[in-house]
Amino acid sequence: MASATLTRRWVLAGLGAGFAAPSLAVAQTATTADLVAKAKLTGTSGFCVADVATGQILDSFQPSAPVPPASVIKAITTLYALDHLGPNHQFTTQVLATQPINAGTLAGDLILSGGGDPTLDTDSLGEMVAALARAGLQKVTGRFLVYADALPAVGRISDDIPVEAGYDPGVSGLSLNNNRVNLEWTKGGATAQMTAPGLQYLPVVQGIKINVVDRDTPVFTYSDQGAERWTVSRAALAKEGSRWLPVRHVAPYVAEVFATLCAMQGISLPPPLMISVLPPATPLITWPSANLSTILLEMLKYSTNVTAETVGLAASGARSLPASAAAMQDWAAEVLGLSATLVDHSGLGATSRVTAEGMVRAIMAGEKRASGAGLRALLKEISLKDEKGSPQIGGPVKIHAKSGTLNFVSGLAGFMTLPSGRDLAFAIFSADPARREAVPIEQRERPPGQKAWVARARVLQNGLLRHWASLA
């Protein structure tokens, strides 16, 4: 049942100004409720806006309705990671050796060790290999060991996403290219290959197989038969092109790319061997990531799921994704006062639930903590749109927020600074989980009706923001 909240601030204003102010308060509530009705969204919509200085709720509609947060939950993951790891935390990737290099040969073991860096890419790996070549390494006669157990191996984030979705990859202590591999093909699928492209390097990936088949649907199939195997419909490859596909077994993929880059530099390696415990060894190369605050800034801007899961797992120290999500859920309840059900750190899982009021109170509480004081600066700045839908770039109202989208789910939460200097915190959610569940998994990349539904949800969000921007 729809509900509207009038705060003590509105009541006191009414008592001080006779009968006019209460009418104004009722008019405001009716206006925002009318915006919800005008959006004609199926499912549930709820919102909440509060004064940051006082914590008073100024306007709300179904603020306690549980809804999937989608990627909006990355704001909570950001607070969690900052609290547990600190803004200056760096993830390191290392190449180590158990013996010195002698006349170009390493008679001992060479170890590629991942420290959980979610931003490692092919060019970074290539620079590490180039440094090995400059150090004189030409051949390894011992073993090539690969350590990725700094984080647990996760095959995929959510199992109700189309198998080919590049935003649903595996998670590992050793990551590369957001844990995706690039499928490239020529016209009609005459040739197709997997690559791990960077700007400076283009290694071909042989360990993940691709086969072009003569069928119309499904476009992709995936199987795991000792190696990752994909098939793709020839009908879908009419024009030359490429697309990213998710990698499920991440560490072997990174190991292969590393070995290929070594070969390109004239360094010969034996086949890789995965290990779960690092032996005593001397670092040859140490590659640090950017500071965590920079990683989180990029994560919030591009809504990178694998980054959210990686930093969440690093923060919790848990050995499975469900356990890690539960740890963040408990922390958010205890520290931020957020009552939620969380199944991951990215919001990709559709069974997570938050409320609009809970989200508002959580981000306000988080920003007041020393560890979360920089949250607003990390959130993406967005612009209000005018009645024609054109962004009002550089306008007097400053908004920093995190958006989130799943099939028939759309959310936005963050902070507004009004021209008067007044700070507001807000959360807006619309969701129709039943409609989402009715869509077959293989159709969930572009389900019928999704685009129009999300467009209406975003019109609602902008309308609410425009309305709240007029508050004194």
Predicted regions: what they are:
Residues 44-46, 103-175, 179, 315-358:
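Mid-domain, small-residue-enriched loop/turn segments at the edges of structured enzyme/sensor domains
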Residues 83-98, 270-274, 372-376:
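Short, well-structured active-site flanking segments
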Residues 147-209, 351-395:
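A conserved catalytic-loop motif detector
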Residues 209-374:
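A small/polar active-site loop signature that marks catalytic segments
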Residues 55, 69-87, 144, 174, ...:
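Active-site SXXK
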Residues 316-430, 435-472:
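Small-residue-rich helix-loop
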